[in-house]
Amino acid sequence: MPFRIATWNLERAANARRRADAQHRMAEMDADVWVLTESRRDLSPGTDYRLVAESAPRDDADADERWVTIWTRVEGGSPRATRDDQFTACASIGGLLNVYGTVLPWRGSTCRGHPSANAEAYIAALSVQHEDWRELGDEPAELCVAGDFNQDLSVRSYYWSLKARAYLECALRECDLVATTAAPNDPVWQLTGGEAACIDHVCLSAGLLRRLSGAPIAWRPERDGRNISDHPGVAVTLTEA
């Protein structure tokens, strides 16, 4: 039976119209697990989903805004602790899959006193999250890391830094994770005819992908000509290989 994992940066879902349009588009995507970034804890993908993990409240935004929320319609989800409760969240889904949601630093942002320049902030944040990935990867459950990586893995540099990309690719390899949304399967690249590339990714345990095939898709962040976000959404559907 197909199983779909999706992630979408909702650009803070700042008004009721955008929230309603986002929910309509998410209903169309029909994912089993959602990792939402720059979202709100009360913005559900649908009535049959439960919020199973969330990052800490943002200190720079409305009380209900979160960098990461994880939703599922699968029974048995529960939150897991992470080393960075501001920009990550983690949940055990059905006891078989750990889902780790992330927002990594964007161009111009800082992290723990590290500047954006020379990808210092990116590398600092990634180093902390990498330890979580490594520990989760040692567990019997499979691992999914998804969210806004703020870094393309495409055939041509799009955003943000070749140095950040090199560190990200190394961290994924060390944790035996595969970015299903990387080149040559980048669905945003395909959606836009090469005008843009994925910076939001769904990464899965290599062992899982040896048993199942993962087909990525992307959708435009709009409904009926109205803009919803500045990020396309992406999803990966897992089926028997």
Locate the predicted segments by residue.
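Short, ordered beta-strand-loop transition motifs
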Residues: 55-63, 82-85
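Active-site regions of metal-assisted phosphoester/phosphodiester hydrolases
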Residues: 1-7, 11-23, 72-241
